[in-house]
């Protein structure tokens, strides 16, 4: 997911990895991620990682300006990684970092030894790889429940000791290496364990947490079916705080992947060690069990108040497998039947009717961070307070001075520390994004949420306003000196009592109430996401006018709908001519050619096997003229002209009435009787009499006579009863007229001769060849009940 411009080389593996100078602009990286993921800025494109080519230089750096990372930081606590070696727990040290526009979290964790730095299976490296791989699910909008990484840097402990805020918590030995991991913190962030301690747990809260856990495990399993988290406990799960009226709901964020693995893709050596004894069973449900079983054992006082929540636990945590164990064991799992195990598959749980959808958080807004600029100072001793003065200035409820230094000799396991909102600061601002938000006064009402105590701080909030204004003015003056900063419009300004904060995920982006500035259109590329090539030039994008507030909200509301490109409304010109006139002239020419030379090319008739010419007057039987000559020669050599043979063609109805036909044919004028006799003589083959007549008449199979000058009355009638372009007969065509015409034609041919004087074989051959020389009548939209059509497959219209 990183962009590629400049090259850096890993000497150990001799692998060339392309990196981007943008990686060294930390604040720009953090801003890019926010705009791409939370604002849904379409100026970025995703560049996915090739999982077949996983190597460490793709996931971390070994050379970085630490002054940029530790510019303005604040100690946040020590948190477990889950790694325990010889009884010693390895913890992360957290610092909250205030950037130019957004917040972030710095996590510092020691490697076990120097060799582990380049070991791709080491759990610390596995954590960095996992966060980067799974972040693709977030940027591709599969899930919001994974905390996004920004950069990972390996540093020596001796380099970290030069920063006064950091040195008390690390080992200064030159042979101790640390992983410095910068992750997102756009809103108020804390562990799920701390959330349970600080807030009242409602039914909707419990249901939402369980659903989010199921959904994120499902989304990961779709991409990586062999994924295992192995420690889905509240103290290893981060969460953003979201608010719906007075209810605070956590949006869980998986970020602790030290014990994770993906079989055959990301191997974790720690899982094969003697220090890890967890059974790998039940696929993703084994991870879910850790969370729901913990909640059942530790939130009983809240769960028992809600019967509907108890029903949810009966489904996701059957009574047979409830226990005081942290992990699901094979003994517990085997207590279930195969049907019960099937119902506990992550996919089946996710689709269960007990959950509505992930949209349970759709009407909530993010809670902004309560950290104030005065709480942050540079990490180096030259421009910061002393460690003692800094700790004295911290809120006593926010920092536990008994937290041990995170060293390899530490024996502390799974401490619980708050890294988000300070314990005595529970006030949550309930601001709404409106067009006149900038006109609101600084004394807006706020809704209070408490777990065991309430807090009012109107005076301190007013004092924070002046701090916020001062900080914002400094930020704006700094932004004006850099081309990548954002020009602010009057619509984009927010109330003066809000601190610089950051965006949201999913539908919560619509509110975006914490943003004080809209994002700039950066012309650089991000490590995680790249700019689209379709963007306008860098100069115009940098100097573009400020983003209009209403337009931005409009785009956010319709973000789930694909954008429609503007239609081209001009006239296309070829040379000096308008394209429309050229096409019109070309079409006229084609039409005239088609009138003079009818063709079946590119026509429906050609697809059906019948051309317009064949349907009108021509016959496709190559032996047709020879057969007709043979029939004509049997008429005592009589080769009369059209008038002598047929009389006046226009008066044929007056010359041949039914009585005359009966006299000529020697029997009463009965079509069925006549054709039964002909059929007995073998003159009509196997054709049905009535349908054969209709086919011959409509398809024009009685072509011209042997000589050129002879007129074909059937051809004339076929021109009178034309076929439509789809090959279907005219609806006004009368089958009785077909019968009359054929009898008149046969009578005229005989001119009083008996039928026995004609060669029956010639007529039978003519009728049989013509019946097979044309496609089925059903294909032309006719009746499929014809006996000859019963064995044919009807075409697309019948």
UniProtKB/Swiss-Prot annotation:
State the superkingdom.
Viruses
Composition bias type Polar residues, residue spans: 519-529
Region spans: Disordered: 432-573
Q: Where is the composition biased (Low complexity)?
A: 438-449, 456-465, 473-487, 495-510, 535-547
Q: Which residues form a coiled coil?
A: none
Chief subcellular location? virion
Q: Where is the composition biased (Basic residues)?
A: 563-572
- Name the UniProt key words of this record, in alphabetical order: Virion
Give GO cellular component annotations, separated by semicolons.
virion component
Residue ranges annotated as compositionally biased, kind Basic and acidic residues, are 548-562
Question: Localized where?
Answer: Virion
Disulphide-bridged cysteine pairs:
none
Q: What is this protein called?
A: Uncharacterized protein R402
Origin species = Acanthamoeba polyphaga mimivirus
